[in-house]
């Protein structure tokens, strides 16, 4: 009976450890995805600013 308890404890412990590792990797992946989205939105806003500067120069609305 003691052997069965130890085996069950070992299986549960290893399952929790692997679950913890998977959750950690998932969080890291989500953080990387968020960082990529922020970079893409920054690039888009830079393109818009460049376009507005160009249009302002053409229309004589310069600084």
Curated annotation (Swiss-Prot):
This is Frenatin 1.1. The modification Leucine amide is found at residue 61. Residues 23-49 form a propeptide. The lineage of its organism: Eukaryota, Metazoa, Chordata, Craniata, Vertebrata. InterPro entries: Frog_antimicrobial_propeptide, FSAP. It comes from Nyctimystes infrafrenatus. Residues 25-63 are annotated as: Disordered. Belongs to the frog skin active peptide (FSAP) family. Frenatin subfamily. The keyword Hydrolase does not apply. It is found in: Secreted. Antimicrobial peptide with selective activity. Is only active against Micrococcus luteus (MIC=25 ug/ml) and not against Bacillus cereus, Escherichia coli, Leuconostoc mesenteroides, Micrococcus luteus, Pastewella haemolytica, Staphylococcus aureus, Streptococcus faecalis and Streptococcus uberis. Keywords: Amidation, Amphibian defense peptide, Antibiotic, Antimicrobial, Immunity, Innate immunity, Secreted, Signal. One of its GO terms (biological process) is defense response to bacterium. Residues 1-22 form the signal peptide. The keyword Secreted applies. One of its GO terms (cellular component) is extracellular region. It comes from the Eukaryota. Expressed by the skin glands. Residues 30-45 have a biased composition (Acidic residues).
């Amino acid at each position: 009976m003691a052997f069965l308890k130890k085996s069950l404890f070992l299986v549960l412990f290893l399952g929790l450890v692997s679950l913890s590792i998977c959750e950690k990797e998932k969080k890291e992946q989500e953080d990387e995805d968020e960082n990529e989205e922020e970079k893409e939105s920054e690039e888009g806003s830079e393109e818009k600013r460049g376009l507005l500067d160009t249009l302002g120069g053409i229309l004589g609305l310069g600084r």
